[in-house]
Swiss-Prot record:
EC number of this enzyme: 1.2.7.7
InterPro entries from the UniProt entry: 4Fe4S_Fe-S-bd (IPR017896), 4Fe4S_Fe_S_CS (IPR017900)
Catalytic function, reaction form: 3-methyl-2-oxobutanoate + 2 oxidized [2Fe-2S]-[ferredoxin] + CoA = 2-methylpropanoyl-CoA + 2 reduced [2Fe-2S]-[ferredoxin] + CO2 + H(+)
Chain positions recorded as [4Fe-4S] cluster 2 binding sites: 23, 49, 52, 55
Name this protein carries in UniProt: Ketoisovalerate oxidoreductase subunit VorC
Native source organism of the sequence: Methanothermobacter marburgensis (strain ATCC BAA-927 / DSM 2133 / JCM 14651 / NBRC 100331 / OCM 82 / Marburg) (Methanobacterium thermoautotrophicum)
Keywords recorded for this protein, A-Z: 4Fe-4S, Electron transport, Iron, Iron-sulfur, Metal-binding, Oxidoreductase, Repeat, Transport
Gene name in the database record: vorC
Cofactor: [4Fe-4S] cluster
pH dependence of function: Optimum pH is 9.7.
Pfam families recorded: Fer4_7
Amino acid sequence: MKKAYPVINRVECKACERCIIACPRKVLYMSNKINERGYHYVEYRGEGCNGCGNCYYTCPEINAIEVHIERCEDGDTDG
């Protein structure tokens, strides 16, 4: 089984919440913390991401979120 997870750039995130709404697994949430630009930012719950990329595709900020998918032992990304 592949392991996928979002990586959020806390400085670039502007708390628009589009990724939270787009996530079918509801693994993202708005942090109570504030970044250096004065915005709250999104955080990952730590498990449950299926690697669909909805968060990445709906984010209006370039480089604010990426989805990483780890390779399986055989080098493939399929589980």
